[in-house]
Amino acid sequence: MNYNKKSIEYIDVKGKKVLVRCDFNVPLNEGKITDENRLVGALPTIKYLMEKGAKIILCSHMGKPKGEPKKELSLLPVAKRLSEMLNKEVIFADDDNVVGENAKKAVEDMKDGDVVLLQNTRYRKEETKNEEVFSKELASLADVFVNDAFGTAHRAHCSTVGVTNYLKEAACGYLIQKELKFLGNAVEKPERPFVAILGGAKVSDKINVINNLLDKVDTLIIGGGMGYTFLKAQGYTIGNSLVEEDKVEYSKEMIDKAKEKGVNLLLPIDNVVADKFDKDASPVVTEDQNIGEGYMGLDIGPKTAKIYSDAIKSAKTVVWNGPMGVFEFKSFANGTIEVAKAMADSDAVTIIGGGDSAAAVNILGFGDKMTHISTGGGASLEFLEGKELPGIAALNDK
């Protein structure tokens, strides 16, 4: 995939109407935004365009309204909070059909530096199907397109891809630029040793990532629920642990591929187990890889955590996607905590691949110790798989 995309500095935006696709898919509780990270992430691009005298038309989806207006998924709270953050009124164009009379009037009345926010793009059923009619309507409002929503870059929707068929100038904003820089470098030209850590529940979610990374990394660390499928592939007993029987053979192939490639594949050598999946279950540490009948693995053990931490500390580039255990249960969070600590203490380039690992790092207060926390869970996974992301591919090359 070509990561060398034109960014906003390369476009003359003064006096031009710029349609910016942001990711304002934020959690709401009774109309109040409970996590503002995505709004904060969008500010550098919006502020730059304001300073340069562009007319800024923001668009985003929120949740899954499935092609019809749902009041609880309106972007009104986002418009209000952005107005406070920017110290400037963000005009909210509240049209159920997104590009309606309110939007057209608001855009027509804009002065340089003004900001308009359109209603939730997924109020339109055409959005997720990337249908021409809605792409054209969105594009008709603007002269230039800027994509700054990495979280939806793996989706070919009207507001991420379709509009670029009608707006010939299409660039990335600062957020996507940063994602391309760190994830792109990690995948294409990492400083070595390069260590990747994969966790989470299922091997099936990470099949292509494992396969792609084995061609690139020096060390691959496996933890989380997916670790038990690998342990079974090595012939160990895993009790009642989560296992994907249909992926045991695949796991064996990956163990062989790692040997062939000279990749140091690290798998758990001890586990923290319990007799039930419950936050109050009593944790028991196994002596070795084997898990007894009636028990299930819920975290990597202390010996494993030490080996994993040492590997991280000797790395120059580290990419992490997926927790090491059931992080939500205090008794089974230690593996994830130890990995996060090792990354926080490291001088390496440390990249967190969005999703649960990003949440874990932020909860632990290590967020500011990481080089880069990706804003896209699904998008960063597809990036690590080596897939082309449609929302990036559609932008102008440098």
Curated annotation (Swiss-Prot):
Q: Might you report a single GO cellular component term?
A: cytosol
Check the UniProt entry and state the signal peptide residues, or none: none
HAMAP family, alphabetically? Phosphoglyc_kinase (MF_00145)
Q: What EC number(s) does this enzyme carry?
A: 2.7.2.3
> Listed GO molecular functions?
ADP binding; ATP binding; phosphoglycerate kinase activity
GO biological process terms, semicolon-separated: gluconeogenesis; glycolytic process
Q: How is this protein named in the record?
A: Phosphoglycerate kinase
Lineage of the source organism?
Answer: Bacteria, Bacillati, Bacillota, Clostridia, Eubacteriales
Stated family: Belongs to the phosphoglycerate kinase family.
Species this protein is from: Clostridium botulinum (strain Kyoto / Type A2)
Positions of substrate binding: D23, F24, N25, R38, H61, M62, G63, K64, R122, R155
| Record InterPro entries | Phosphoglycerate_kinase (IPR001576), Phosphoglycerate_kinase_CS (IPR015911), Phosphoglycerate_kinase_N (IPR015824), Phosphoglycerate_kinase_sf (IPR036043)
